[in-house]
């Protein structure tokens, strides 16, 4: 049996020694390393090489370079060398983290904006002041026109009440009342329905003057049929009521302009009540009718005052000073006539 066959039969754990080499324990072989691709440097050792370079293996070419990376002081793995980007916020000496910066928002850290922030350019404040000044001028103009109208009416009532000749003339010529009523009605329709006309100066003031003169004549003629004491009392009560309602409408938080629909329905009911009083001549019924009329037009005075002030749901345009004066004037005249009716019927 040959030497190889005896090894297989005996079952020794070591193969037979090759000829020419001593038999005995041998030094461990270094681990097998896969050769790199052609042209690449040898793989690094298990330890980290120092910056000065370690000697390579006997079969390697000198110190080992960094595999696949350029040599240099503290190379960045896989990234190009360059200065680090600066934060948009200056460094904090106390080590606090910088505030969060939205990438889509403009950079404010370098303070390169031109001019103040946008809210300084807001033009709402001058417009608010301008609107307030316009409203105040509108209120002054309306009350000036209203004062002139009431002065004309009060003078006419005083003449028709205290001058006997005038009182006798108007009582003898009742047809003048109907003429003045027709003039008043036409001018009232024109000023109420024709918006362009009542904004056209000076024709709006001309129409308002005609309406004031015709209505003053009517009121003076009605007052001439009552005694002087009743007229003076009605003037005083009307002045007190109107002054109180105007002050209350300026101070209250309640919005009377929201009740416009209810007041219009009440006017229709009052008109039907007036037709009933024409056919049923009763003193108590006339006092009730006059009381309801005075109350209704007192509410209208409150509504028109708030429309004039413009601080509630509905308001008048500053161009409608003629229309505002017309509303207040007719409200006050109707309150005076209803109060005069109440006093006159109560004294009978």
Curated annotation (Swiss-Prot):
InterPro entries the record matches: Bax_inhibitor_1-related
Compositionally biased residues, Low complexity: 42-57
GO molecular function, one term: monoatomic cation channel activity
Transmembrane spans: 142-162, 174-194, 205-225, 230-250, 260-280, 284-304, 323-343
Protein location: Membrane
GO CC annotations, alphabetized: endoplasmic reticulum; Golgi apparatus; Golgi membrane; membrane
UniProt-listed Pfam families: Bax1-I
GO terms for biological process, alphabetical: apoptotic signaling pathway; endoplasmic reticulum calcium ion homeostasis; negative regulation of endoplasmic reticulum stress-induced intrinsic apoptotic signaling pathway; negative regulation of extrinsic apoptotic signaling pathway via death domain receptors; negative regulation of neuron apoptotic process
Keyword presence, Nucleotide-binding: no
The entry's keywords: Membrane, Transmembrane, Transmembrane helix
Signal peptide: none
Record bears the keyword Membrane: yes
Record field: compositional bias (Pro residues): 14-41, 82-101
Protein topology in the membrane: Multi-pass membrane protein
Region of interest: Disordered: 1-118
Family statement: Belongs to the BI1 family. LFG subfamily.
Function description: Potential apoptotic regulator.
Name of the protein described by the UniProt record: Protein lifeguard 1
Organism, scientific name: Rattus norvegicus (Rat)
């Amino acid at each position: 049996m040959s030497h190889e066959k005896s090894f297989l039969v005996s079952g020794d754990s070591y193969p037979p020694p090759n000829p020419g080499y001593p038999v005995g324990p041998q030094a461990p072989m270094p681990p097998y390393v896969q050769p790199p691709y052609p042209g690449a440097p040898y793989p690094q050792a298990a330890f980290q090489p120092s910056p000065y370079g370690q000697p390579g293996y006997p079969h390697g070419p000198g110190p080992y370079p960094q595999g696949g990376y350029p040599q240099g002081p503290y190379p960045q793995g896989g990234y190009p060398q360059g200065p680090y980007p600066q934060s948009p916020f200056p460094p904090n000496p106390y080590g606090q983290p910088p505030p969060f910066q939205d990438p889509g928002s403009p950079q404010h850290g370098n303070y390169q904006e031109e001019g103040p922030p946008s809210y300084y350019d807001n033009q709402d404040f001058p417009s608010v002041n301008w609107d307030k000044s316009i409203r105040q001028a509108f209120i002054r103009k309306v009350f000036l026109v209203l004062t002139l109208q009431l002065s004309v009416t009060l003078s006419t009532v005083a003449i028709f009440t205290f001058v006997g000749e005038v009182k006798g003339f108007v009582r003898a010529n009742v047809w003048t009342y109907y003429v003045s009523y027709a003039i008043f009605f036409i001018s009232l329709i024109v000023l109420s329905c024709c918006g362009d006309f009542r904004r056209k100066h000076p024709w709006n003031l001309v129409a308002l003057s005609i309406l004031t003169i015709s209505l003053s004549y009517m009121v003076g003629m009605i007052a001439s049929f009552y005694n002087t004491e009743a007229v003076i009392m009605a003037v005083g009560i009307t002045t007190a009521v109107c002054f109180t309602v105007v002050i209350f409408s300026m101070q209250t938080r309640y919005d009377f302009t929201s009740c416009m629909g209810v007041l219009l329905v009440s006017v229709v009911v009052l008109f039907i009540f007036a037709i009933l009083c024409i056919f049923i001549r009763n003193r108590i019924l006339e006092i009730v009718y006059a009381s309801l009329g005075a109350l209704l037009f007192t509410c209208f005075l409150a509504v028109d005052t708030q429309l004039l002030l413009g601080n509630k749901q509905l308001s008048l345009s500053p161009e409608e000073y003629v229309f505002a004066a017309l509303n207040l004037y007719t409200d006050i005249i109707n309150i005076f006539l209803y109060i005069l009716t109440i006093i006159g019927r109560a004294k009978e």
